[in-house]
Structure formats: C-alpha cells, structure tokens
Design a protein with these regions (language model features):
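Conserved phosphate-coupling serine/threonine residues in phosphotransfer and NTP-handling enzymes
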Residues: 99-101
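Active-site neighborhood of HAD-like aspartate-dependent phosphohydrolases
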Residues: 1-26, 43
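Short, acidic loop-to-helix structural element flanking the phosphoryl-transfer center
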Residues: 65-97
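Short, basic/glycine-rich phosphate-binding loops at helix/coil junctions
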Residues: 58-67, 114-117
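An amphipathic alpha-helix signature
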Residues: 5-9, 33-34, 38, 57, ...
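Phosphate/oxyanion-binding active-site loops and adjacent basic polyanion-contact surfaces
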Residues: 1-4, 73-76, 127-134
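Asp-based, Mg2+/Mn2+-dependent phosphohydrolase catalytic module
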Residues: 47-51, 85-86, 104-187
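N-terminal glycine/serine-rich phosphate-binding loop of ATP-dependent small-molecule kinases
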Residues: 5-8, 14, 47-52, 59-63
Length: 187
C-alpha cells in the first residue's frame, strides 16, 4: 500500500473511528478520494456529508505535509517535470491535470515533486467522484476540439476510464509496466 493510500485511510479513521474498509481500492465504484469516502460512509451506515469530507481532507493534507517534512518531497519520475514543461510550451498541444485525489492534496504532492502547475487546469475529486467525469471536465477546460487525447496514468482505473472515453492511455510507473523515466522521450 502506498504512503498516500495509508495516510488516506488513516485520516478517515482519525475522523470517524473504526470503520470497515473494502479489501482493495478496485472494490470501490469510484476510485477517487471523494468516491471512496462516499461509499465507505455508506458501507458503515453514514450519509455523505461535506463537513466529514472536509475534516478527512484536512487531516489527510496535514498527514501529507508531515510526510514531506520527515521523508522529503514526493518523487517525480525522472524527466517528468521537464516533459510537462516542454508540452506546455508546444503550440499544438494542451495540458490539463485530471486527478482522483482532492485538489489540495494533489497540488501539495505535485508542487513538492517540483511541478509548476500554476497555469495548468486541474480537475479533482472535489469536482466529481467519477474519474470519467473528472477527465471529461479536465478536457473541457482546455477545449475539446482535438484529433486525439492522450492520458498518462499509473493505475488500472485510469486505463479503464480511458477505454470508456476512447482516449489513448500511456502507463506510467511500475504497477502497469509503464514509463519509469521520461529522459530522452520527445513529447
């Protein structure tokens, strides 16, 4: 289990106490921070509540900050920061971030890894619990008149969402046998 996932479920338990959690993230209908939380609350006899979501998010973000202070920044894949910077400079390409995380936690992790995302539209689970809707909204923020859309993701739920949307999927990281270094890759 990743540090991120451990901190996420630890934050839920700090706010709600002992709760039942499904065995795998893939067991949730929407593998996003708000999607998992909504289903976890329902599984444990609670109704989704914005105040509970805000409380869990605050504890989670503070846990991420503590992790960064003690362990250092979240690492970027070699060359990823430069790759994104280069794409942002291209006239024929657009960049948006679609994340299943909450906005505050996503920004914190990305900035700690060295990404400058100030001018990049970001859509998160604050906007929708559905990954497909998050991805559609991110595309809408940059215009949807493209010949093709390529999505870089690190999990099978990203891959499934791309299949649903008809987008090209590029696996990132070891879990899907994807890109482990952007060094030398021409966008």
């Amino acid at each position: 289990m990743s540090v991120d996932t451990e901190l996420y479920f630890s934050s839920i338990r700090k706010v709600l106490g002992a709760v039942n959690v499904r065995k795998k993230l893939d067991d949730y209908d929407h593998v996003t921070d708000n999607g998992i939380l909504a289903q976890l609350l329902e599984d444990n006899g609670y109704s989704f509540d914005d105040e509970v979501s805000a409380a869990v998010q605050a504890v989670f973000v503070e846990g991420l900050r503590q992790h960064i202070r003690s362990a250092g920044p979240f690492p970027a894949i070699d060359g990823a920061v430069q790759f994104v910077e280069h794409i942002c400079e291209c006239n024929d390409r657009r960049v948006a971030i679609a994340t299943g995380g909450w906005r505050k936690s996503a920004v914190l992790k990305l900035e700690s890894a060295g990404f400058n995302i100030e001018d990049i539209p970001l859509v998160s689970s604050d906007d929708s619990p559905s990954r497909v809707e998050i991805m559609r909204s991110a595309l809408a923020k940059i215009g949807d008149d493209f010949e093709s859309v390529t999505y870089f993701g690190d999990a099978k739920w990203d891959q499934r969402a791309c299949k649903t949307l008809g987008w090209r999927f590029v696996a990132v990281g070891p879990d899907l046998g994807g890109i482990e270094s952007y060094a030398g890759i021409d966008p």
